[in-house]
């Protein structure tokens, strides 16, 4: 992975055990982000709107005693399909292995409040932030050990695992136990239908990313095929079926507005079909008196 030296702003590549402690930035993309190629000329890069949040994240990392930072806009060479595929398949782990994640909310002006009324207004803007509506920020919320939220002016709003867990629950529908580093309620241990219900509330720019942004949460690797549309979401479900005997993957709702009339699959046509599926829980085979869950497999015909 490439990391930014927070002092020189230069990029350096690391791998395996050589990767140093680093901070990581989570944000929503705007119209003038700085690419890997553009970062090679820092004078030109600094003229783009996307530069300021990278600079701010570097300053925050320095304040936190860290020398390295990862940002998805300029640390990945997106002109290389192989590098992009590797990065997307690795991204959950990169967030999980970070020392701290800075969630930057460009649509929350400041985290500074002077009274209770200001605090209430801040929390309302926090819950309504676009950051909570994007597909990619779901794993960025759940993978790191620590997530600290910052407003547009880089004032701190609070952390996921402590002061903001209730607000995040209200904004996302994600149970608080998955937010506070509960040793029992790891996000990876949540049932398939629960994870899909989290996704159903989010949007992406390219519909394939509805599948690709969930690879880490399901601990799945699969090739990226931009241009395949919603077939990517079907492929994701097929990989889940192959790797996990979790029956909640079938707990989806037939919604006529999103389900093709000729749909004959056991798999859902869209994450929206899971919008009410958070209430289902995967069964523990160790507690099943019948001796375990029935198994299933994908064939060249069907499930």
Give each language-model segment a name.
Residues 177-303:
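Short helix/strand-capping turn motifs
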Residues 1-13, 18-200, 251:
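Intrinsically disordered, low-complexity acidic segments that are enriched in bulky aromatics
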């Amino acid at each position: 992975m490439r990391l930014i030296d927070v002092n020189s702003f230069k990029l350096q590549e690391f791998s395996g055990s050589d990767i140093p402690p680093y901070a990581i930035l989570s944000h929503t993309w705007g119209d003038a982000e700085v690419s890997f190629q553009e970062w090679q000329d820092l004078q030109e890069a600094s003229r783009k709107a996307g530069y300021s949040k990278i600079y701010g994240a570097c300053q925050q990392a320095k304040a936190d005693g860290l020398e390295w930072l990862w940002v998805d806009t300029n640390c990945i060479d997106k002109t290389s399909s192989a590098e992009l595929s590797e990065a997307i398949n690795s991204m959950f782990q990169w967030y999980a292995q970070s020392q701290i994640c800075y969630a930057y909310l460009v649509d929350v002006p400041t985290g500074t409040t002077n009274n209770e009324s200001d605090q209430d207004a801040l929390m309302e803007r926090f819950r309504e932030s676009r950051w909570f509506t994007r597909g990619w920020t779901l794993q960025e919320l759940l993978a790191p050990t620590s997530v600290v939220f910052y407003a547009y002016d880089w004032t701190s709003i609070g952390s996921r695992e402590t002061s903001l867990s209730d607000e995040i629950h209200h904004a996302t529908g994600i149970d608080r136990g998955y937010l506070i580093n509960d040793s029992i309620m790891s996000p990876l241990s949540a049932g398939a239908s629960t994870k899909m219900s989290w996704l159903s509330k989010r949007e992406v720019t390219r519909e394939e990313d509805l599948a690709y942004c969930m690879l880490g949460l399901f601990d799945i690797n699969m090739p990226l095929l931009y241009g395949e549309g919603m077939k990517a979401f079907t492929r994701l479900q097929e990989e889940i079926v192959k790797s996990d005997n979790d029956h909640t993957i079938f707990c989806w709702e037939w919604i006529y507005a999103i389900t093709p009339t000729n749909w004959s699959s056991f798999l859902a046509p869209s994450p929206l079909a899971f919008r009410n599926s958070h209430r289902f829980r995967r069964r523990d085979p160790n507690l099943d008196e019948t001796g375990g869950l029935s198994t299933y497999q994908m064939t060249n015909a069907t499930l």
